């Protein structure tokens, strides 16, 4: 057995792709447009690691997804937690849980999916502007 992917439903595919690809840094590795089923599947992966994938499911017709099915969060290891958070901020993403400890941060996708970022190799030295920033909203 091997892990394949985690599926998340999105309400605006273009906005979601800007978040996951441009801001977070994932890349699109496969896309399936199903005219009969009226949906699009987009598979994303971190550069250099296509084994762990996120599947964005976009239904062409409006649907109310309601509260998730006990879904927690997506998590990614990053080479530089501060650079990753700055990149997200530069794309207009709110850092809900700043990396005050130099190790962990949380943001939310356009569809309110919680995304955790963890510093590769353990904590970095805490530094400003991050170490004095409070949490913002839910994470």
Residue locations for each model-derived region?
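A generic fold-level signal
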Residues: 1, 36, 51, 66-69, ...
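Vicinal oxygen chelate
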Residues: 2-11, 29-32, 41-46, 62-139, ...
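Active-site/binding-pocket entry motifs
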Residues: 49-50, 62, 123
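Short, mixed charged/polar active-site loops
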Residues: 51-53, 114
């Amino acid at each position: 057995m091997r892990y394949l992917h985690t599926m998340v439903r999105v309400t605006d595919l273009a906005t979601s792709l800007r978040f996951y690809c441009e801001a977070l840094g994932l890349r699109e590795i496969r896309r399936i447009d199903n005219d009969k089923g009226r949906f699009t599947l987009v598979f994303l992966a971190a550069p250099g690691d296509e084994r762990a994938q996120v599947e964005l499911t976009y239904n062409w017709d409006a649907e109310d997804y309601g509260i998730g099915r006990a879904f927690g969060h997506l998590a990614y290891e990053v080479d530089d937690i501060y650079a990753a958070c700055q990149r997200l901020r530069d794309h207009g993403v709110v850092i809900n849980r700043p990396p005050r400890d130099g190790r962990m941060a949380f943001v939310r996708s356009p569809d309110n999916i919680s995304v955790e970022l963890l510093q590769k190799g353990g904590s970095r030295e805490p530094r400003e502007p991050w170490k004095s920033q409070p949490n913002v909203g839910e994470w």
